[in-house]
UniProtKB/Swiss-Prot annotation:
One of its GO terms (cellular component) is endoplasmic reticulum. Associated with the plasma membrane of several cell types engaged in sucrose transport, including the mesophyll cells of young sink leaves, the companion cells of mature phloem and the cells of developing cotyledons. The gene is SBP. This is Sucrose-binding protein. The lineage of its organism: Eukaryota, Viridiplantae, Streptophyta, Embryophyta, Tracheophyta. Keywords: Membrane, Signal, Sugar transport, Transport. It comes from Glycine max (Soybean).
Length: 524
């Protein structure tokens, strides 16, 4: 009898072993209640049906069934966890692949085309307003400037841009044309004339209208919006108070009872007032109306307290850097501690590079440059570490990143962004000067570091460190970076009667190859 029991137990344990081996290949099933597992029910039933088993044998058998069931559940959970992790990993790989494909389709995440990346918000016979897409829609690399939006206003001759206010701080730059800005304070309207090169800051919520006072030419205004809403970064809206059917007045959202009570005017008169305008938000006006909207005298005060008058002309300011090959004018937060530039931590710059000339290769320490080409053609190159992973399919065993060249031809209406620390260079074409205005964000304490010209960062490096960094004699390195042509710059500067101030004269120079390399491609 003992031999039969042992034999039966051996057979049963062989049956359990077979079940264990099937776990790895069986399909995982969710069980809410332990007794509902058919394998567990079958196992326990067979234990009870073995007549040759003693009560002790049956207990051992039932315990083996329970132990097998627990092991099965643990194994199923493990398989489920492994399956979940595998799916998550596959999903991450797909997302990374899609992101990489998206970036490969757009090899210039810092370049914005006029015909591709601007959307038209307003368009009438009198003009249009185009807004550049959010910077983060182009690339996640631009999250730091997500809350800045660039817009371009184009208005035909003798047009009126209806009164509105924005839920954003706005910096206006007059690219071309002659304008009148009407700024509404609590008690009156302050009228300010804008000439080409004028820049002005409009505080958020300030009602304003714009007039193109020129009889023949279009007006082009660049507008940098800095939305003040913390809940929707990078999103700004315009609100029309005066209006009718087109543009629709913001007051139309209120009930007639509320409007009648607030304005103490019957509904009929209110309907007459808010039902007349249907010409759109930009429309032509007569010469007499333009004359009536012009300032009667030159303003000497600013109706909004708390800051100095926020208007200046960057074209007329003395250049920060200038020679026969280019001119850079900067107005920044360090120029006036009480200015709106200080509060917005913003620098405004104007660059004019002479044809067949270039800026030095340089980078900003703190500022992110948002540049708009306003005239001329040229070329841009940026050194970018973020793009290097997709520029090469092979991984190099190195202790430093690789760098990818982002390059683009430049023409009027294009926008490009240069993050801090990224070396870049701009080059004017052979036939015309390259003119750009730049909004430099986070500009406080910003410094420019150059790689070419007098006093560049390599030439300023001490010789021992220079030799260690290049693993090359410092005399040979100095022969490359201590260019002798900056001496020619001094001579040319004297011929042009230009002041010589260290790096300033060597910030711009002609775009020409060394004599031994002339005739080869510059971008080789």
């Amino acid at each position: 009898m003992g031999m039969r029991t042992k034999l039966s137990l051996a057979i049963f344990f062989f049956f359990l072993l077979a079940l264990f081996s099937n776990l790895a290949f069986g399909k995982c099933k969710e069980t809410e209640v332990e007794e509902e597992d058919p394998e567990l029910v079958t196992c326990k039933h067979q234990c009870q049906q073995q007549q040759q088993y003693t009560e002790g044998d049956k207990r051992v058998c039932l315990q083996s069934c329970d132990r097998y069931h627990r092991m099965k559940q643990e194994r199923e959970k493990q398989i489920q966890e492994e399956t979940r992790e595998k799916k998550e990993e596959e999903s991450r790989e797909r997302e990374e692949e899609q992101q990489e494909q998206h970036e490969e389709q757009d090899e210039n995440p810092y370049i914005f085309e006029e015909d591709k990346d601007f959307e038209t918000r307003v368009e009438t016979e009198g003009g249009r307003i185009r807004v550049l897409k959010k910077f983060t829609e182009k690339s996640k690399l631009l999250q730091g400037i997500e809350n800045f939006r660039l817009a371009i206003l184009e208005a035909r001759a003798h047009t009126f841009v209806s009164p509105r206010h924005f839920d954003s701080e706005v910096v206006f730059f007059n690219i071309k044309g002659r304008a009148v800005l009407g700024l509404v304070s609590e008690s009156e309207t302050e009228k300010i004339t804008l000439e080409p090169g004028d820049m002005i800051h409009i505080p958020a919520g300030t009602p304003l209208y714009i007039v193109n006072r020129d009889e023949n030419d279009k007006l082009f205004l660049a507008m940098l919006h800095i939305p003040v809403s913390v809940s929707t970064p990078g999103k700004f809206e315009e609100f029309f108070a005066p209006g009718g059917r087109d543009p629709e007045s913001v007051l139309s959202a209120f009930s007639w009872n509320v409007l009648q009570a607030a304005l103490q005017t019957p509904k009929g008169k209110l309907e007459n007032v808010f039902d007349q305008q249907n010409e759109g938000s930009i429309f032509r006006i007569s010469r007499e109306q333009v004359r009536a909207l012009a300032p009667t005298k030159k303003s000497s005060w600013w109706p909004f307290g708390g800051e100095s008058k926020p208007q200046f002309n960057i074209f007329s300011k003395r250049p920060t850097i200038s020679n026969g090959y280019g001119r850079l004018t900067e107005v920044g937060p360090d120029d006036d501690e009480k200015s709106w530039l200080q509060r917005l931590n913003l620098m405004l710059t104007f660059t004019n590079i002479t044809q067949r000339s270039m800026s030095t290769i340089h980078y900003n320490s703190h500022a992110t440059k948002i540049a708009l080409v306003i005239d001329g053609r040229g070329h841009l190159q940026i050194s970018c570490p973020h793009m290097s992973s997709r520029s090469s399919h092979s991984k190099h065993d190195k202790s430093s990143p690789s760098y990818h060249r982002i390059s683009s031809d430049l023409k009027p209406g294009m926008v490009f962004v240069v993050p801090p620390g990224h070396p870049f260079v701009t080059i004017a074409s052979n036939k015309e000067n390259l003119l750009m205005i730049c909004f430099e964000v986070n500009a406080r304490d910003n410094k420019k570091f150059t790689f070419a010209g007098k006093d560049n960062i390599v030439s300023s490096l001490d010789n021992v460190a220079k030799e260690l960094a290049f693993n090359y004699p410092s005399e040979m390195v100095n022969g490359v970076f201590l260019l002798q042509r900056f001496l020619e710059r001094k001579l040319i500067g004297r011929l042009y009667h230009l002041p010589h101030k260290d790096r300033k004269e060597s910030f711009f120079f002609p775009f020409e190859l060394p004599r031994e390399e002339r005739g080869r491609r510059a971008d080789a």
